[in-house]
Amino acid sequence: MKIIIAILIFSVLILFHELGHFLLAKACGVGVTEFALGMGPILVSWGKGETKYAIKALPFGGSCSMVGEDEDDPAPNAFGNKKAWQRFLVIVAGPVFNFLLAFICSLFFIGFGGVNKPVVYSVGEAASAGIQRGDIVRSINGKKITLGREIPLYLFSHPLDGSAEIVVERGGELLTKTVNTHREGWRMGISYMADESGCTLSQISAQSAAESAGLKAGDILVSIDGTKISTGKQLSEYFTAHPLDGSLIELVVKRGGEELSFRFLPSHYETEDLGFSAEYYYDDAAHLGFFGLVRYSAKEVVYWIRYTLMSLRMLISGQVGMKDLSGPVGIVDTIGQAVETGVENGGAGAAALNVLMLMILLNANLGLMNLLPIPALDGGRLLFILIEMVTRKRVPQKFEGLVHLIGFVLLMILMVFVLFNDVLRLFGK
């Protein structure tokens, strides 16, 4: 099922991209010889005027083949014989149409799923600075915030350093608060899940005090320092009354029917955070009105463009490695996970919203990548047209073709590498 959904998503993405090229080519008088969805052998084709329309066997890809696109052609409707601004519009239309599709998907995503307003829904240490539940975050250190998800994106590229100036809206009034962001304390390095069977350790953090002591995921908590623990409430109450202070602690757990005792020192930590949460609050879009819906939909697209730019910056700076890149196989797996998670948490409607969010991300990603000056992609061709428009001298077509050929070969090598990564990642699961 996830493969079918992924094929449909890829098909819509590429069809819209190529449709942009197609419509602007027709508008600028460029002859289109073939407009196809997919690659490889033709399954179905039909003709209308000068254009052959086709559906091909492989669902990944698509094409809008124009007269004189890659070679000299004396025909007046050849792509190469059109003015530079006309060629620019034809090429840039593909990425622009991806942004347009991302915007359309955002309208549905926000209309049915709600708007991700930066409303404070949980307050920790920031309460001492006057931050309250229900406050709407308007800016952090002067950076305007419109969506809740913009907060972690901002913090990733602007690390906190002791304090932060937060502007919040409360009852229609803007208030400026300065919060202390430095946190330090003690932790064991465990996560737990509480159910009928008790408090089960669900995760042990790598290189944590708990891991060094020998605790394992799946252990069932019996007691802490002699106090019996059988529910999540009891555990929370215990740490409220006895916060970790670096002293020796004893945990008794049940593993395989046997009770085991572990004594260890919690580890000290220092970190920075805002002391409140406002990232994942969703408000009903019904009160937004038409222009509000359009505004927030545009912000959603801008958010994913910025997210893609940040990911590229991380790749270039070495914060993430080439092994973290994903291709079609990895995207299919991600789509499958999004559908499964949605069905488990909220049924078909939640799954559809997850798919819509992925559509927004993928369209923003495809649109942006095709605007970058990468040979063989739209951005590379746009660069040569811009050079021509500035210098008023056209770059020799043979030289441009050679540059695009080299770029295409390098992209194919990258695709093979990414495919190999995807397969290794899948088998690694």
PLM feature spans:
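Alpha-helical transmembrane signal-anchor/signal-peptide segments
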Residues: 28-29, 33, 113-132, 429
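Functional transmembrane alpha-helices
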Residues: 81-82, 187-208, 212, 220, ...
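PDZ/PDZ-like peptide-tail recognition elements
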Residues: 86-122, 152-157, 162-205, 250-252, ...
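Conserved PDZ fold ligand-binding element
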Residues: 128-148, 210-233, 301
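Small-residue-rich helix-interface/hinge motifs
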Residues: 2-75, 369-391
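Alpha-helical transmembrane segments of multi-pass membrane proteins
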Residues: 10-14, 65, 98, 102, ...
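Final/C-terminal transmembrane alpha-helix of multipass membrane proteins
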Residues: 402-422
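Internal alpha-helical transmembrane segments
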Residues: 27, 51, 58-122, 413
